[in-house]
A protein has these predicted regions:
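Basic polyanion-binding and macromolecular-assembly surfaces
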Residues: 1-3, 7, 134-329
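Extended, compositionally biased
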Residues: 8-54, 61-62, 71-180, 264-268, ...
């Protein structure tokens, strides 16, 4: 009903009808969050990427998100363990990226390569009932169960943070700047509790016999991406990277390209991986005129940005999480 007036904005409608805005907000909202800008005096946020929450407004991390990180970490583990066995995958990825085309089409082709050349041989080790690989039936991931991670303690607050990037343009000093994108984030230091169970009769197929070993794999994957960023940004952000050494995994939609992909692990060298990815970013992912110019501006790493979070007085690398076992079944 509030949006049936001629004005589509809620705030003017409330003022027009002499309603107290703060009072209405308190009644209809089950949570609130402070907003932090990279620098003061910038425009107010428009669209905000929301944090997943329960019906009661408590933030949580879906088990599917955690399992996605585990999935990538397992693939990474085997690529690192037997690099020559998976060396043939890179030329196929390189061909798709260099060829270019529509974003959705390239994404579909790359997903197919990862599924056929990595997921099927590494994870698809259960008895095959059909000619086509079916991850739901054949994947070793069936043997790993992960619950949602629920926030502990009385505080259930979140923060609205402006996107904060540090760019490393070839031949220039590091440039830290805010971008007109805002994300609802979980404050640093918050604790979550979740459970992980492995069925050893299934996970033995990939030589995984304990949860402790699984977390070693996720940490290795996190360290791989952090180390590449540290080569570029480590000297300027020493404290942030010292804290990053404690991370066991990297979570979140804004945590950066390296935490979500395996391309650098598959490339024969960082230099080749960077050049191919720079071309792919320019010709497929970001094709608007006057866009990022990765081919010309990126140095040793594509993308050339470090994702940070700041509340003014404090600053962190975005998405870092550490793990501690509190009970064992």
């Amino acid at each position: 009903v509030l949006f049936r007036s001629k004005s589509s904005a809620l705030y003017p409608w409330l003022k027009q009808h002499n309603l107290d805005v703060k009072d209405v907000v308190r009644k209809v909202c089950n949570s609130s969050a402070d907003v932090y800008f990279v620098r003061q005096g910038q425009a107010n946020p428009n669209d905000i990427v929301r944090q997943v929450k329960s019906p009661m407004g408590a933030p949580y991390i879906p088990g599917s998100t955690l399992k996605g990180v585990i999935h990538s970490a397992i693939l990474f583990h085997f690529i690192q363990k037997e690099p020559e066995k998976y060396r043939h995958v890179w030329p196929k990825i390189k061909d798709v990226m260099n060829r270019g085309g529509k974003r959705w089409q390239c994404g579909k082709e790359l997903d197919k390569i990862v599924k056929q050349e990595l997921e099927k041989p590494i994870l698809g080790r259960l008895p095959q009932r059909t000619k086509r690989f079916d991850g739901a039936l054949q994947s070793v991931m069936k043997g790993i169960s992960v619950s949602d991670a629920m926030m502990m303690g009385d505080k259930k607050d979140t923060l609205i943070l402006q996107k904060y990037d540090v760019s490393a343009v070839r031949g220039e000093s590091l440039d830290d700047h805010g971008i007109s994108v805002f994300r609802e984030c979980i404050p640093a230091g918050r604790k979550f509790k979740f459970s992980v169970k492995i069925d050893k009769t299934i996970t033995k197929e990939i030589d995984l016999y304990s949860v402790d070993e699984l977390w070693k794999w996720t940490k290795a994957f996190a360290d791989f991406g952090v180390e590449k960023e540290k080569q570029i940004f480590g000297r300027a952000y020493t404290g942030e990277f010292q804290e990053a050494d404690l991370a066991d995994l990297i979570l979140g939609g804004g945590a950066g390209f390296l935490s979500k992909t395996l391309y650098y692990a598959l490339a024969p060298s960082q230099e080749e991986g960077q050049k191919v990815l720079a071309k792919f970013f320019d010709n497929v992912l970001f094709t608007r005129k006057n866009c990022h110019h990765h081919g010309d501006k990126d140095g040793k790493l594509t993308p050339r940005t470090l994702k940070l979070a700041t509340t003014g007085s404090d600053r962190w690398i975005l998405g870092l999480a550490s793990l501690k076992e509190v009970a064992s079944c």
